[in-house]
Amino acid sequence: MDNPPPTGVAPRHLPPGSVHTGKVTASLSHRRPDSVQDAPPAPVPHRAHGRLREVPHIAGLVLGVFAVACLLWSLSPALRFLTGPPRRFVDDYYFDAPDTNVMWALIVGLLAGAIASRKRIAWWLLVGYLTLFAVANGLRFAAEQNINALVAMIVQVGVVGLLIAAWPEFYTRVRRGAGWKALGVLVGGLAIGCLLGWGLVEVFPGSLPPGWQRPGWAVYRVTAAILVENEHFGGHPRPFVNVLLGLFGAIALLAAVLTLLRSQRAANAMTGLDESAIRGLLEHSDVEDSLGYFATRRDKAVVFAPSGKAAVTYRVELGVCLASGDPVGVREAWPHAIDAWLRLADRFGWTPAVMGASEEGATAYRRAGLSALRLGDEAVLDTRDFSLAGPELRQVRQAANRLRKQGVRVRIRRHREIPSAEFEQIMARADAWRDTETERGFSMALGRLGDPLDADCLLVEAVAADDRVLGMLSLVPWGRTGVSLELMRRDPQGPNGVMELMISQLALNSEQFGITRVSLNFAVFRSVFEEGGRIGAGPVLRLWRGVLLFFSRWWQLEALYRSNVKYQPDWVPRFFLFEERRQLPRVAVASALAEGFLPRLGKDPDASAHTGAQSAVPDTLTGLHADGSPPDWPKPDLLDSGPRRPEQVRVRMAKLDRMTAAGVDAYPVAYPPTHTVAAARRSPRGTTVRVCGRLLRIRDYGGVVFALLRDWSDDIQLVIDRERVGAARSAEFGEYFDLGDLIEVSGQIGRSRSGELSLLAADWRMLGKCLHPLPDKWKGLADPEARVRQRYVDMAINPETRDVLAKRSAVVRSLRESLNSWGYLEVETPILQQVHGGANATPFTTHINAYDLDLYLRIAPELYLKRLCVGGMEKVFELGRTFRNEGVDFSHNPEFTILEAYEAHSDYIRMMHTCRVLIQNAALAANGSMVAMRPGADGALEPVDISGDWPVKTVHGAVSAAVGTEITPRTGVAELRELCDRVGVPYQHGWDEGQIVLEMYEHLVEARTEEPTFYVDFPTSVSPLTRAHRSTPGVTERWDLVAWGVELGTAYSELTDPVEQRRRLTEQSVLAANGDPEAMELDEDFLQALEHAMPPTGGLGMGVDRIVMLITGRSIRETLPFPLVKPR
């Protein structure tokens, strides 16, 4: 029966003689599929869903048990004797059960498998056979009045009726194959078997009389002629002769079946068009799978998604439709390709399974209803990180160095660079060095070394000093920057270490070939070998490891793991997927057959040539080549592959296309304006100016067009008078320009008829076409989240946003100028740091590949600035970015700007004055006076005077006032806990006095502070970098500046005693080791610098973003141009 294409796939037959050569001429297009094809597919509806859905399984089971019984009593005389009476009864009335016939046992067994697989042709055979048997029983009853025949007829009629009722459950087809060839093999095999059997009967005739009965007996037993009975003969030969005669027939039938199966596989394997399409999908895929290129293996079949944008390659073994790796093609079309594959398997009664899927592919298959099992891990080398240095790669380094000393070198070439004559020698070496009779691999091997279409593959060879090749690797492309190992060979007589040398040199020299990833071997059940060998592994795990070690004697399971782990690769999981657990044994055997771990009857499938007779390529794919070369598809249109555009955007893009077609450059080169808008507005009437800006409003009154133009400085009205510029030019403005466009306008300053100051436009040109419409002209961006995400739009239409950013710039400039005027030197210290210190905060971590070193993004520049103080800088400051992995709210952002300044021969009192003056100067620069903006009762911002001195309060005094009970640095932990319980302040039981007081301060004092206030003298335990107070024990010389519930800055009298500093940082490092993410680590470099002596120093730290918040009255998200936001 013909093999129909999967749903939605039109068959395409190759013209005669064009399978291996010649190219198909087609339109060079890759048509976009209809939206219906891109819709998510419905789950595959198995048609075995009726009330009688179990009939095929039950019938197949009964026939299977009967076939096994036939085989057993055919081989065992004792069993044949014991089962004689019931066997003869069944043989007479229900089903042929010859006493000794292996051929008949095989026939019934094949029928059982076909019935269980719901094959329609098997249904016809079984129903026809049972019908004939029932008719024979009916005739026998009519002639002999045999009640057993009547009962048997009724049973057979009932079974036939049940099978007819279950007809819809037998829906699977048989693939096209060489039926006549298989029939010829069967007839020829039976003929030879009959001749051999005749000779055998003549030698061992037993009681058979001479003449026609001896050859007749041979034909009867070899062909399993069920219409002939033993009673037709005058005797019988020796019993072992019957077994051999049945075996002759079974061998002939088995040869015919294998011929049919091989022809089915070859006829339905990949065609040149299929391979061409797969190569195109690999080039245009948005997913790079290390096993993707193996989809071009030619003994596989392929099924495409209806759109042609994805495909699944597979092979059928033992009724298992075994897919290999992930689907090929665009990820969005994977579900459609998987759906087509499952429907195909359902149509032919195959059991679907997947070998070697990645985590992403396994997820797609699981969504289609399959179950996943982790099969093992793939070893992947990232060549950018690979180095032979370090103890982990000692074994590889020593092996490679030993061979290099012997003069062995490594040669790496693309296949295209190798002459064909040399490739013949390479293929001969590969065959000679193969350690198995057949080439292993299905999902991770090509099986066609030297094919011209694999020109981009890499060949790595180890060459001895005498030019003798000692080993070789062949690797296939993996996306654009990777290669995947396909073949590995070494000379059995060569030295050890050849593989280590080739792989290490490939990784070290990968850059010249544009390679960043190398996929090595696949380690089956890697976790079992790794974890099962550890101390403390459980008995089940150890037993499972022992079983794998036992089978490793033949299949090299552990050897593959050991050979890969020495390179310290990244282990990427691979998965095995199946439909039902009861199918696992058959699926496992089919997988072992496909991968070459089990011997196969007959020849292996041909993986080097295109043997398929019918292409599975859908009509949506054109420009394919019958020789399998990549198709003539154009490069993907990046605009088409982008996001779906709203209608207004599409309209503007169409307008852009019209402008381009008309020769108008929508994005021209720069030509500076003569005036800003603000300068133009100040110019006398009649002055000719050229200004640039964004169009924010257009009003067309027919004869005259009014528009509003805005640049950073101001707005101005444009007047475009048709009488002045001409009708064509005026119409062009309305045709091409939209709100949001950037425009350059030339003309004279004048006034409109209503007296409004305007620019009377004489000429203009587009500076930048805006492809998105602007928000509502009155409300702007009303959503605060949108204002943050689209800050550029908010700035374009909202003057307040521009004003805040301008004030931020003024604040930063004022801080820098004030410090410069006082003699401070500005420096830059590292942002990437090996030790996080300078503050108690959780850091961000990163990694530098060059040194294979974990680093932190700095939480403070303090420790580096103090080293500069040790070096002699008496006044130094840094204004830069700092990063802390903490919360995001009104006043916190993960990255922020900090100002730290240090002055020698100063203290925290001096820095208090410095801080106040810096903030007041910044307010003056931003607001024009020493005021901070605060929301009033109606929500509008109102100025608050911050000039003059600010209050100063001790921490303990402020907390005492808040709780109504006096506390001092000498107050004990128990009393502080009672106070916390009374006022509702949370605390941890491991905290000391200082930590509890700090928690009370943050909840009761800091959060309730309004006008700027300095809180001084913090507990020593929470100030590890601060000098002890000169007169009050238990506290340090530190202050925090707080205004309206927000901490603005802090300052210390710096701790310069290196011994005390080491003690405090050691305490912090202990906390860090105990899991405190905010505790500082021990910085030996800083401590060593401090031991060289640092002068008494005052240090100041200020959050610049919070200073801007204070001065502008805005949140931190409003004062930053681009605060961090969650991804959409």
Swiss-Prot record:
Mg(2+) 1 binds at residues 1040, 1047. GO terms for cellular component: cytosol; plasma membrane. The keyword Cytoplasm does not apply. Residues 633-1128 are annotated as: Lysine--tRNA ligase. Its cofactor is Mg(2+). Gene3D superfamilies: Bira Bifunctional Protein, Domain 2 (3.30.930.10), Nucleic acid-binding proteins (2.40.50.140). One of its GO terms (molecular function) is ATP binding. Keywords: Aminoacyl-tRNA synthetase, Antibiotic resistance, ATP-binding, Cell membrane, Ligase, Lipid metabolism, Magnesium, Membrane, Metal-binding, Multifunctional enzyme, Nucleotide-binding, Transferase, Transmembrane, Transmembrane helix, Virulence. Residues 1-47, 619-644 are annotated as: Disordered. It is found in: Cell membrane. Its EC number is 6.1.1.6, 2.3.2.3. The chain crosses the membrane at residues 55-75, 97-117, 121-141, 147-167, 184-204, 240-260. GO terms for biological process: lipid metabolic process; lysyl-tRNA aminoacylation; response to antibiotic. It is a multi-pass membrane protein. Residues 1-632 are annotated as: Phosphatidylglycerol lysyltransferase. InterPro entries: Aa-tRNA-synt_II (IPR004364), aa-tRNA-synth_II (IPR006195), aa-tRNA-synth_II/BPL/LPL (IPR045864), LPG_synthase_C (IPR024320), Lys-tRNA-ligase_II (IPR002313), Lys-tRNA-ligase_II_N (IPR044136), Lys-tRNA-synth_II_C (IPR018149), NA-bd_OB-fold (IPR012340). It comes from the Bacteria. In the N-terminal section; belongs to the LPG synthetase family. In the C-terminal section; belongs to the class-II aminoacyl-tRNA synthetase family. HAMAP family: Lys_tRNA_synth_class2 (MF_00252). This is Lysylphosphatidylglycerol biosynthesis bifunctional protein LysX. It comes from Nocardia farcinica (strain IFM 10152). The gene is lysX.
